[in-house]
């Protein structure tokens, strides 16, 4: 689940 969060943070 960390990978999904990391991707969201990068997009943010």
Swiss-Prot record:
Keywords: Calcium, Disulfide bond, Hemostasis impairing toxin, Hydrolase, Metal-binding, Metalloprotease, Protease, Secreted, Toxin, Zinc. Contains 3 disulfide bonds. Ca(2+) binds at residue 7. GO terms for cellular component: extracellular region. Expressed by the venom gland. GO terms for molecular function: metal ion binding; metallopeptidase activity; toxin activity. GO terms for biological process: proteolysis. Its cofactor is Zn(2+). The keyword Ubl conjugation does not apply. Residues 4-12 form the Peptidase M12B domain. It is found in: Secreted. Binds 1 zinc ion per subunit. It comes from the Eukaryota. The molecular weight was determined to be 21,390 Da. Belongs to the venom metalloproteinase (M12B) family. P-I subfamily. Snake venom metalloproteinase that impairs hemostasis in the envenomed animal. Monomer. This is Snake venom metalloproteinase. It comes from Crotalus molossus nigrescens.
């Amino acid at each position: 689940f960390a990978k999904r969060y990391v991707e969201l943070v990068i997009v943010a």
